[in-house]
């Protein structure tokens, strides 16, 4: 075999290609769109923290200039101008990402609206309108919303009435996942690594492979969705290692950071399919319901200390980063 042929065979057999071959759709988790083309992901996800990190890079100064210019023209007060500029910045990043990925981009609603159903709906509609004004169809955008009671209800209405596709994020519990499926949202992002972080911190133990609590959580959700025929896509998110990814091969989607995508691309470790719809149907438990019972949803979520703490922490972190992003844009709007 010639050297180029050997090299080609090696690339074809890398762990990333095997993961894709397992049936899992690979998504790039970053705002740094310059780093994703080589991985050939189907979709890309962003969040306030990732956009903030990317916005600080000189490479993306042009996008900020466009957003600031837009903000200045669309707002009477500085506050309005800054908010409009930030919304436009999210759309600018989304537009650039969609030049690279063939599928969809996830763009997040301001995390400070996580407990306000109506404000979340209005912000989602506004973001979609901005995308459409830039020639991007709503079919190519997923609106990311925190999986609070209010967020899930907002997503339900957006999906039903507006045909706006939603990605329910900061999902740490089976309770949240069940309610999202009943709301018929397009996609959920159950977090894996952050669940592992909590258990390691609270027990002092290490968890590997199938014993990883984050992996167990996603498997349970996947099995339940497949058993009861829910069409909501399960997209595992927030990974600490390629080991977590390996143990979820076969799940609908996985959104992975460029650093871990790079590791997968440069590894030839076998990635056999672990999850599949047929065995999932045998493993899931009884059907339950939350979508019309707010008190039951809140109580059962509250019973899960990990999910309650991680949801609160996640909203605080994303809110802090959106405030920092607003401050960064305000300096430019008022300069």
UniProtKB/Swiss-Prot annotation:
Pathway field: Carbohydrate degradation; pentose phosphate pathway; D-glyceraldehyde 3-phosphate and beta-D-fructose 6-phosphate from D-ribose 5-phosphate and D-xylulose 5-phosphate (non-oxidative stage): step 2/3
Spans traversing the lipid bilayer: none
Gene Ontology terms: biological process: carbohydrate metabolic process; pentose-phosphate shunt; pentose-phosphate shunt, non-oxidative branch
One Pfam family matching this protein: TAL_FSA
EC number: 2.2.1.2
Catalytic EC class: transferase
Top-level division of the source organism's lineage: Eukaryota
N-acetylserine: residues bearing it: 2
Keyword Acetylation assigned: yes
GO function terms (MF aspect): transaldolase activity
Reactions listed under catalytic activity: D-sedoheptulose 7-phosphate + D-glyceraldehyde 3-phosphate = D-erythrose 4-phosphate + beta-D-fructose 6-phosphate
Active site: 144
InterPro entries: Aldolase_TIM (IPR013785), TAL/FSA (IPR001585), Transaldolase_1 (IPR004730), Transaldolase_AS (IPR018225)
Record carries keyword Glycosyltransferase: no
Function: Transaldolase is important for the balance of metabolites in the pentose-phosphate pathway.
Anything else known: Two isoenzymes seem to be encoded by the same gene.
Family: Belongs to the transaldolase family. Type 1 subfamily.
Known partners and oligomeric status: Homodimer.
The protein's name in its UniProt record: Transaldolase
Species this chain originates from: Saccharomyces cerevisiae (strain ATCC 204508 / S288c)
């Amino acid at each position: 075999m010639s050297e180029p042929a050997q090299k080609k065979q090696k690339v074809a057999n890398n762990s990333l290609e095997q993961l894709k071959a397992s049936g899992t759709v690979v998504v790039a988790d970053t705002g740094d769109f310059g780093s994703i083309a080589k991985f050939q992901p189907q979709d890309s996800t962003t969040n306030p923290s990732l956009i903030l990190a990317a916005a600080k890079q000189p490479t993306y100064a042009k996008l900020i200039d466009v957003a600031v210019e837009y903000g200045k023209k669309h707002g009477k007060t500085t506050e309005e101008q800054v908010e409009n500029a930030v919304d436009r910045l999210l759309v600018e990043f989304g537009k650039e990402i969609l030049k690279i990925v063939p599928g969809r981009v996830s763009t997040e609603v301001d995390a400070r609206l996580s407990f306000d159903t109506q404000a979340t709906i209005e912000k989602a509609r506004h973001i979609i309108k901005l995308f459409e004004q830039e020639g991007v169809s709503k079919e190519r955008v997923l609106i990311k919303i925190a999986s609070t009671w209010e967020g899930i209800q907002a997503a339900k209405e957006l999906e039903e009435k507006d045909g706006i596709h939603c990605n329910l994020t900061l999902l740490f519990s089976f309770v949240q996942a069940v309610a999202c499926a009943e709301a018929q949202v397009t996609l959920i992002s159950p977090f894996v690594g952050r669940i592992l972080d909590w258990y390691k911190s609270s027990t002092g133990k290490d968890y590997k492979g199938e014993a990883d609590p984050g992996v167990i959580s996603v498997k349970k959700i996947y099995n339940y969705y497949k058993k009861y025929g829910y069409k909501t896509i399960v997209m595992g998110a927030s990974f600490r290692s390629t080991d977590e990814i390996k143990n979820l091969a076969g799940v609908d989607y996985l959104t992975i950071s460029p650093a871990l995508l790079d590791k997968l691309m440069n590894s030839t470790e076998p990635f056999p399919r672990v999850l599949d719809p047929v065995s999932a149907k045998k493993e899931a438990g009884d059907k339950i319901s939350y979508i019309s019972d707010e008190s039951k949803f809140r109580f059962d979520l509250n019973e899960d200390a990990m999910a309650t703490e991680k949801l609160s922490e996640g909203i605080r972190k994303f809110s802090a980063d959106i405030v920092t992003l607003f401050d960064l844009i305000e300096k430019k709007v008022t300069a």
